[in-house]
């Protein structure tokens, strides 16, 4: 891959040098043009305009790119793995959701990120790095870190110290006669919690990208502590399995026979409900990262799932053309750079993965974006997932709800959970 970058550097120097020579020698009719390529990008319809604008800005950064033209296909990030039937005629640079990395890798649609571009990705933090990696390789460029959750709370009823730990939050809610809404019976939330003390999974793949083995350590002390945290929260009287704006006022959650009247003072939820919650709460609206939890004397910040959107580079359209592939990587790298993420935030208020952009006043003023950015350092990337990701945690939560799983027998349940997670379908 370094050779690809070198060839592009040589190409750039050659073009610039010839342009300079020709400007000083008007009688020289010999010219060398920059290579002409049509680079096809893909992503959502909403991102078409800003992506093409940024591509044109990239083109203007070097004479070596002056021969480029850009095309855009509207292919949803959640569908690109199945919507593209033939990757030899697919998009060159495409946007995708982080949980699509396994099928895209298996189809040979992912070119490894060149070493020179790794520092920019690594500076984004462990969540973004994790989302971009599979099979021991960094395969993509993260640009949107917004598909995750954090804590909304009523700042007229709770102080910052009340929401710093889950134990303190539940105790304060009990004092107020209110509830903390945390949908732990749903795997998206319970699975996120189970990473809190460091338990995780690892994949082994074959040369075709198929998963051949999954190992995990949720049956270790790290997993057992997470299991105890799940039990401690779900058995607390102030905990409630729901979502809802924490207005502190009477409200109804659920539907039909499962509907209950309640007063919610804090809620774990995602960016997608920020506008609704802010409208419902008015000046009581506040949000922050998830609180800490303490088990057996060890304190950790509650973990979460965080889904990303990334740019992948398709090697099949370059067909061995190293210069074209290098240009595609350079474009993808530019699209996740500081200036591009700043412009994308202005255009679409997309949650930046670049830490400098995330720290800007205009970004931090949007509290839900600041909160998810703060939580990102404690989040597990929703990237490559075991087949049982959405069933095994649900079964675990059900065992707690039914009174079957307790802090005394949590080791047995976490051993069974570990077996379920590592079982290939």
Please provide the spans of the model-predicted regions.
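Conserved N-terminal structural module of periplasmic/extracytoplasmic solute-binding proteins
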Residues: 4-9, 15-100, 419-425
């Amino acid at each position: 891959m370094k050779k690809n970058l070198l060839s592009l550097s040589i190409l750039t120097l050659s073009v610039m040098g010839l342009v300079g020579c020709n400007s000083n020698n008007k009688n020289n009719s010999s010219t060398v043009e920059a290579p002409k390529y049509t680079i096809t990008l893909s992503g959502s319809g909403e991102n078409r305009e800003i992506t093409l604008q940024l591509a044109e800005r990239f083109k203007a950064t070097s004479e070596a790119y002056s021969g480029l033209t850009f095309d855009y296909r509207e292919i949803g990030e959640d569908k690109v793995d199945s919507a593209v039937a033939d990757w030899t005629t697919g998009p060159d640079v495409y946007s995708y959701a982080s949980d699509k990395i396994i099928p895209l890798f298996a189809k040979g649609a992912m070119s490894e990120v060149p070493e020179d571009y790794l520092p920019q990705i690594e500076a984004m933090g462990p969540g973004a790095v994790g989302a971009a990696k599979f099979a021991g390789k960094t395969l993509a460029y993260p640009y949107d870190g917004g598909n995750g959750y954090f804590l909304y709370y009523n700042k007229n009823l709770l102080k910052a110290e009340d929401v710093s730990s889950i134990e303190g939050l539940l105790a304060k809610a009990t004092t107020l006669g209110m509830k903390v809404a945390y949908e732990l019976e749903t795997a998206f939330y319970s699975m996120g919690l189970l990473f809190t003390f460091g338990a995780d999974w690892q994949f082994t793949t074959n040369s075709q990208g198929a998963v051949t083995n999954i190992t995990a350590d949720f049956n270790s002390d790290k997993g057992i502590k997470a299991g105890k945290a799940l039990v401690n929260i779900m058995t607390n009287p102030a905990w409630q399995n729901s979502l809802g704006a924490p207005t502190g006022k009477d409200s109804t959650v659920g539907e039909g026979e499962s509907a209950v009247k309640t007063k919610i003072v804090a809620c774990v939820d995602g960016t997608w409900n920020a506008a609704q919650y802010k409208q419902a709460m008015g000046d009581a609206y506040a949000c922050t990262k998830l609180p800490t939890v303490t088990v057996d004397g060890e304190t950790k910040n509650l973990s979460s799932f965080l889904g990303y959107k990334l740019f992948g580079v398709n090697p099949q359209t370059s067909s061995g053309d190293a210069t074209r592939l290098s240009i595609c990587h350079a474009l993808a790298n530019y699209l996740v750079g500081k200036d591009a993420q700043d412009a994308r935030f202005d255009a679409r208020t997309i949650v930046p993965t670049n830490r400098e952009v995330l720290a800007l006043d205009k970004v931090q003023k949007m509290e839900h974006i600041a909160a998810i950015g703060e939580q990102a350092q404690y989040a597990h990337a929703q990237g490559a997932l075991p087949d049982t990701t959405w069933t095994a945690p649900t079964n675990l939560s059900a065992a707690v709800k039914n009174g079957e799983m307790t802090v005394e027998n949590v080791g047995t349940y976490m051993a069974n959970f570990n077996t379920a997670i590592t079982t290939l379908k």
